[in-house]
Amino acid sequence: IMLDGEDITYQKEHVRSKVIGHLFQDPLKGTAPHMTIEENMALAYLRTTTSKNAYFSRIKAADKKKFREQLALLDMGLEDRMKQPVGLLSGGQRQALTLLMATMVTPKILLLDEHTAALDPATAEKVLNLTKKIVSEQNITCLMVTHNMHQALELGNRTLMMDSGNIVLDVSGEEREKMSVDDLLEQFAVRAGKALDNDRILFSKVEA
């Protein structure tokens, strides 16, 4: 696995985490529930440091101010709850916080593993809009896994479809811009030799 010209295939996880941000489908996986919002953000902020004791250093006033300002951008009122344990937050709030933590120090690549799939529609849309805003403003290279075909065509600048671990379709540019969800599913059927039968994918086809 090459990232920015460097082979990271066998790098230790704590080394890779300095340059790779990630969000899981489960909003409970990206944060430490028994630690406060402030403490979770401090861990994320300090993950790129070379000091072995950095994670245990005292959170400075300047850092707290920065955390508060960044939380305010989420428009969820979390900036006024920095001393509360993350375990008290809703799934959507935790996922938004995880997104913020993953991009506090701009990563070389952001991996999104169906990060809105477990959220209710309204919350999912809010988190997705936050994602688009942060990725655009920080110019982050992003790889997003989704079963939603509308999202697969609407977001980013390239769509890849996989079957049994293999890439069977790769579209971008003008071809992608003109492609509808029906076109995408038809192309997949031609390349993979079979139609999609995943209920989640077929349900997303009739949305919007």
Where are these regions (language model features)?
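Helix N-cap at the start of a conserved alpha-helix in ABC-type nucleotide-binding domains
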Residues: 121-123
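Q-loop/switch helix immediately C-terminal to the Walker
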Residues: 35-49
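ABC ATPase NBD Q-loop/coupling interface
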Residues: 1-16, 58, 173-175
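ABC ATPase nucleotide-binding domains
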Residues: 177-208
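ABC ATPase C-loop
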Residues: 102-103
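H-loop/switch region of ABC-family ATPase nucleotide-binding domains
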Residues: 146-147
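Helical segment within the ABC ATPase nucleotide-binding domain
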Residues: 125-138
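Catalytic Walker B motif of ABC-type/P-loop ATPase nucleotide-binding domains
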Residues: 110-113
